[in-house]
Amino acid sequence: MDRAPQRQHRASRELLAAKKTHTSQIEVIPCKICGDKSSGIHYGVITCEGCKGFFRRSQRCNAAYSCTRQQNCPIDRTSRNRCQHCRLQKCLALGMSRDAVKFGRMSKKQRDSLHAEVQKQLQQRQQQQQEPVVKTPPAGAQGADTLTYTLGLPDGQLPLGSSPDLPEASACPPGLLKASGSGPSYSNNLAKAGLNGASCHLEYSPERGKAEGRESFYSTGSQLTPDRCGLRFEEHRHPGLGELGQGPDSYGSPSFRSTPEAPYASLTEIEHLVQSVCKSYRETCQLRLEDLLRQRSNIFSREEVTGYQRKSMWEMWERCAHHLTEAIQYVVEFAKRLSGFMELCQNDQIVLLKAGAMEVVLVRMCRAYNADNRTVFFEGKYGGMELFRALGCSELISSIFDFSHSLSALHFSEDEIALYTALVLINAHRPGLQEKRKVEQLQYNLELAFHHHLCKTHRQSILAKLPPKGKLRSLCSQHVERLQIFQHLHPIVVQAAFPPLYKELFSTETESPVGLSK
């Protein structure tokens, strides 16, 4: 009699192990919806966590999405968030359903077909063992591994390639982009190039700057001349560049102190860097600007807004956490494509992304903001602050809307957002950097590129209007504070339902609550 419970317990463990084996085998098959790494069978179809969550949310609120094109948008890992209508239709066409049967109830024919596909995927992986592989986080991954996998960094290695799911990043002149902690790896060739009728080359003199007691452009609020900041212009002065000076809490001015022994930067190289950053940005935009503009008349009705307001706090937080995580994944892809970023050590890549990813998302949000009626694009339509009332953090939402409103007043071009967000991300003042010199070099290159582009387009005036760094930090701090309050109220929801990457970046508690199995 005493052995019966033991046999039942052993049988349960064996059944659990068998199910786990089946699940791990299934995960070798990519998501049927977008091609990302799958995490098992969800609603009857092999999908990734992202598509599973998207389908669950669409069914909860009986969402009625619309397509701005011809209802045939491609759905893959990089485009899946651009058209919710086509994504949902693909989910339904492939058989996703709330009433779908589970794996254990599949027919023999279905199981045999699934087994054959698993074997096919395993064979393909064996053939590709000699090729570079970009890892993706396993379902439920937590801690630093999540961001490491998202970056595509194998343990102990630092590949320089980009994700295979995105177009290849364009190459830039190695002289300008090499980030070396020691030695003059920067291009030493003097180049003369025409810009708005002016012919010039830039020279930086660290010794001259130190002799005059200046730390950087960030250390003074007064206007600086080329002589004061260590720039030398030959033949003609570059219009505007030498006169740009901002306060210590601004992204607007070059921190020339940061450059190593790197005397010269040709305008040709700077222009190439501008083009590279803008291309990387275009390839990693979550939503196309033309689609956002086309949807501005598509506003949530009063009934739809009421529906959002009646949602529980935890459901609304979960929704926003998933949307924010998707946006951050695009920022990670953007970072990987910034020339020189993947040459940084793994620690510094993670430090920069943990500190700057949310800030970049906040800047990018201004594209999805309509200043005419103070609404933002969310889940297929535009809505105001009242849409997010269920979150219980009206002050944070109001601050974010105000920030987007102030940025939209600058009328950023897409290229300006690209260069500005690159500077927001590559910030050598982030605490915890191991090779600060390399980050300073990258930051300096991007500062030159940003200023070059603004001078070329006669937009130098926006530098004085850029929000201070402290504003972005304040918004991020408010977000973390509100998350901590929510996490205190609903620890199990955060642990079980929030994306691992979101928890790694923002949550202060990574331990599972008592009684919650991993």
UniProtKB/Swiss-Prot annotation:
Residues 105-183, 238-258 are annotated as: Disordered. Its main location: nucleus. It is found in: Nucleus. Changing residue 397 to N: Nearly abolishes transcriptional activity. It comes from the Eukaryota. Signal peptide: none annotated. A motif (AF-2) lies at residues 501-506. Nuclear receptor that binds DNA as a monomer to ROR response elements (RORE) containing a single core motif half-site 5'-AGGTCA-3' preceded by a short A-T-rich sequence. Key regulator of cellular differentiation, immunity, peripheral circadian rhythm as well as lipid, steroid, xenobiotics and glucose metabolism. Considered to have intrinsic transcriptional activity, have some natural ligands like oxysterols that act as agonists (25-hydroxycholesterol) or inverse agonists (7-oxygenated sterols), enhancing or repressing the transcriptional activity, respectively. This is Nuclear receptor ROR-gamma. It comes from Homo sapiens.
